[in-house]
Regions:
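Outer-membrane beta-barrel porins/channels
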Residues: 21-32, 38, 42, 48, ...
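N-terminal low-complexity or amphipathic/hydrophobic leaders
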Residues: 53, 62, 70-75
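Short N-terminal leader segment in a subset of presequences, especially plant chloroplast
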Residues: 10-11, 31-34, 70
């Protein structure tokens, strides 16, 4: 498959962005420890674990594990959405599909200055599936996107209060689309390369500021289209291609353990800017007739706030709450059945418990879809509604 670089990967593939946990088709589920605060504190490694290998490897320079030099965190999240289209005529079409998102993170301190890390994550994806006879089946029935991102990084502690990091991402992506159309199925895969840079400033013993940039990843999908048997003699099953650029993201955050009477609390906040505006058109080449679709996405902001509580009765326990607002990149006029994206509001809670060399974390988020989710495209006239439950668990081992 081949989408032009101006395209939204979303358009070509998506699991309804409405139910990917981040804006567009971005997945915001990198670590159960971060899930408890709606991902606030991820860029400053507020949880003192290996999940910063994805969010901001430079923060790993300030890992506090005593004489332990290696930390491994493994997490998984169950995404349980409710998503449906309701037409102005009253007809309802469900398209939600439950999914599981795994993640792996590791960090090793070679000395006081150099730390290496590795993350294996699924930063983009999800899935939607309508009944094959629903009224918009010509526009989409099954949409599936899977990504796997392999991201080694190295961080350098320049001074006692400043660290920087750099890394490379090798990202695999696979997409499959089905629809009630002459070409009833299209699929393709791609490998792309990206990079990441991080900066962390520890301005106090219990205070940090973090910055992270993740580059765009360029994908050149190749695959094939399968035509219905009635059209096969004319259309065949051609090879198709599409070029897609995953957008740049910029994140800045702050973590602060409170002093004096409030020293059992820590507060944190993260802000992420995603440059979705580079996606304005979808093009697929190799088909019998040219195909393109206007996307015209906009850049988005995400802000999250979190709170940790460290109970006096048990020094090994951490309790977490958080909330976030995640802006949609999709304009109403360009909303499609494959990407019925809307703004989201997060409410999250979680806990962590340290037991010897192990730490166990659990997180839960309830994500509401808010704002305008109307659609008026090709006879599909109505709106989308729904919400998401995300349940995550994580184990961390240090040695």
């Amino acid at each position: 498959m081949k989408l032009s670089k101006k395209i939204s990967l979303t358009a070509l593939l998506l699991a309804p962005a409405l139910y990917s946990s981040g804006a567009g088709f971005q997945i915001q589920e990198q670590g159960a420890s971060n899930m408890g605060t709606a991902m606030a504190g991820a860029v400053t490694n507020a949880n003192n674990d290996a999940t910063a290998a994805f969010a901001n490897p430079s923060a790993l320079s300030f890992l506090n594990k005593g004489d332990k030099n290696t930390v491994i965190s493994i997490s998984g999240a169950a995404v349980l959405p409710t998503l449906a289209y309701k037409g102005n005529d009253g007809r309802v079409a469900d398209c939600a599909v439950n999914s599981y998102v795994p993640n792996f993170f590791a960090a090793h301190k070679f000395n006081d200055r150099i730390t290496a890390s590795m993350s294996i994550t699924a930063p983009y994806g999800l899935e939607s599936k309508y009944d094959k006879n629903w009224q918009g089946n010509a526009q989409g029935i099954h949409s599936y996107l899977m990504t796997a991102d392999f991201n080694p990084s190295v961080s350098l502690k320049i001074t006692d209060w400043l660290s920087v990091s750099g890394g490379l991402s090798a990202q695999f992506a696979y997409v499959k689309l089905t629809q009630n159309a002459p070409y009833e199925k299209m699929s393709g895969d791609s490998w792309g390369i990206g990079g990441n840079i991080g900066i962390t400033i520890q301005y106090a013993d219990e205070g940090r500021i973090g910055f992270s940039w993740r580059s765009s990843v360029h994908h050149e999908f190749s695959g094939d289209a399968h035509s219905k048997s009635a059209y096969a003699p004319i259309l065949g099953n051609p090879d198709i291609e599409a070029e897609v650029d995953i957008p740049h993201t910029f994140t800045v955050g702050v973590y602060q353990r409170l002093p004096d009477l409030f020293d059992r609390f820590a507060i944190m906040a993260d802000y992420t800017y995603t440059m979705w505006s580079s996606f304005d058109e979808l093009k697929v080449s190799g088909l019998a007739a040219p195909f393109s679709e206007k996307e015209d996405w906009k850049d988005t902001s995400r802000i999250s706030l979190g709170l940790h509580y460290y109970p006096k009765f048990d020094e090994n326990l951490t309790l977490r709450i958080g909330s976030a607002f995640d802006e949609s990149p999709v304009k109403t006029v360009n909303r499609t059945v494959r990407i019925p994206c809307g703004d989201r509001v997060w409410f999250s809670t979680g806990a962590g418990y340290k037991y010897g060399a192990f730490t166990f974390d659990a997180g839960y988020s309830y994500i509401m879809v808010v704002g305008n989710t109307d659609i008026n495209k090709g006879g599909v006239n109505g709106h989308y509604y729904g919400h998401i439950h995300v349940i995550s668990a994580q184990i961390t081992y240090e040695f």
